[in-house]
From Swiss-Prot:
<feature type="binding site">
    <location>
        <position position="100"/>
    </location>
    <ligand>
        <name>DNA</name>
    </ligand>
</feature>
<feature type="active site" description="Schiff-base intermediate with DNA">
    <location>
        <position position="2"/>
    </location>
</feature>
<keyword id="KW-0234">DNA repair</keyword>
<dbReference type="Pfam" id="PF06827">
    <property type="entry name" value="zf-FPG_IleRS"/>
</dbReference>
<dbReference type="GO" id="GO:0140078">
    <property type="term" value="F:class I DNA-(apurinic or apyrimidinic site) endonuclease activity"/>
</dbReference>
<dbReference type="InterPro" id="IPR012319">
    <property type="entry name" value="FPG_cat"/>
</dbReference>
<keyword id="KW-0238">DNA-binding</keyword>
<dbReference type="GO" id="GO:0008270">
    <property type="term" value="F:zinc ion binding"/>
</dbReference>
<dbReference type="GO" id="GO:0034039">
    <property type="term" value="F:8-oxo-7,8-dihydroguanine DNA N-glycosylase activity"/>
</dbReference>
<feature type="zinc finger region" description="FPG-type">
    <location>
        <begin position="251"/>
        <end position="285"/>
    </location>
</feature>
<feature type="active site" description="Proton donor; for delta-elimination activity">
    <location>
        <position position="275"/>
    </location>
</feature>
<dbReference type="InterPro" id="IPR020629">
    <property type="entry name" value="Formamido-pyr_DNA_Glyclase"/>
</dbReference>
<feature type="active site" description="Proton donor">
    <location>
        <position position="3"/>
    </location>
</feature>
<dbReference type="InterPro" id="IPR010979">
    <property type="entry name" value="Ribosomal_uS13-like_H2TH"/>
</dbReference>
<keyword id="KW-0479">Metal-binding</keyword>
<keyword id="KW-0326">Glycosidase</keyword>
<dbReference type="Pfam" id="PF01149">
    <property type="entry name" value="Fapy_DNA_glyco"/>
</dbReference>
Length: 289
């Protein structure tokens, strides 16, 4: 699933190309792509038609377009929330595989914005905007914590939350209610950089070490963002269909059997929450039982 850097790459591409444009036509090619929009595909297409795109925003792994739509009495602002799922893509112009296009929108300048999704886990929905902790976010996103790249992210406050958690640190890093945007890849990378094993119970770690993990998460995601994100296959691409190349810089994730770039020990892989965790047994020793 795309994590914060990959979603932010897509958001920036959309911000540059669709802000200020008006949606003139929408077609839903697969009903699963709008299953999260409770009112159904006909309602979504009717409300999107004629809507002006005011801008784009993101929290964690969730992306949305802020729209100005025609209300009953006056224009109202609403959000087109985009969930990329495992393989969702927001593409501008020509699409490499038209068979995977689930939704297409025509803009007033002739641009076609397509939502392609090979596995059909993602989708679009329209949602009201609400103010939460000083930020305007769509209702489905309101429960998410701020992410490490949010200017208002409070590292000390998150550390205090983690100090109260009596489960594995990595499990907490993946909990979007604690800190959003971090997925399996960047959790492993942040833990490697901070020399902390994710199997440690969060509450047993000192504030300094927890803070180091959060700072490492922010650092590695900024670096990934600068390189277009991490693409292990063709499923993650930017709005122009181009893959990121940060996978070449990964220090832990996906490197089972390879030497640690810091100490030379062999990177290990373990099963964790139906996923895989990658770590260095020397730099990141497991907690003592």
């Amino acid at each position: 699933m795309p994590e914060l850097p990959e979603v932010e790459v897509v958001r920036r591409g959309l911000q540059a190309h669709v802000t200020g444009r008006t949606i003139t036509e929408v077609r839903v090619h697969h009903p699963r792509a709008v299953r999260r929009h409770d009112a159904g595909p006909a309602d979504l297409t009717a409300r999107l038609r004629g809507a002006r795109i005011n801008g784009t925003d993101r929290r964690g792994k969730y992306l949305w377009l802020t729209l100005n739509t025609a209300g009953v009495h006056r224009p109202t602002d609403t959000a087109l929330v985009v969930h990329l799922g495992m393989s969702g893509q927001m593409l501008l112009g020509a699409v490499p595989c038209a068979a995977h296009v689930r939704i297409s929108a025509l803009l007033d300048d002739g641009t076609v914005l397509s939502f392609a999704d090979q596995r059909t886990f993602g989708g679009w929905l329209l949602a009201d905007l609400v103010t939460v902790d000083g930020s305007v976010v769509p209702v489905p996103v309101a429960h998410l914590a701020r992410d490490p790249l949010d200017p208002r992210f409070d590292c000390d406050a998150v550390v205090k939350v983690l100090r109260r958690k009596h489960s594995e640190l990595k499990r907490q890093l993946l909990d979007q209610r604690v800190v959003s945007g971090i997925g399996n890849i960047y959790a492993d990378e942040a833990l490697w950089r901070a020399k902390v094993n994710g199997a440690h119970v969060a509450a047993t770690l000192r504030c300094r070490r927890l803070g180091a993990v959060l700072h490492a998460a922010a650092d590695v995601m900024r670096e990934a963002l600068a390189k277009g994100g991490t693409s292990f296959d063709s499923l993650y691409v930017n709005v122009n269909g181009e893959s990121g190349y940060f996978e070449r810089s990964l220090d832990a994730y996906g490197r089972e059997g390879e030497n640690c770039r810091r100490c030379g020990a062999v990177i290990r892989r373990e099963r964790f929450m139906n996923r895989s965790s990658f770590y260095c047994p020397r730099c990141q020793p497991r907690p003592r039982k």
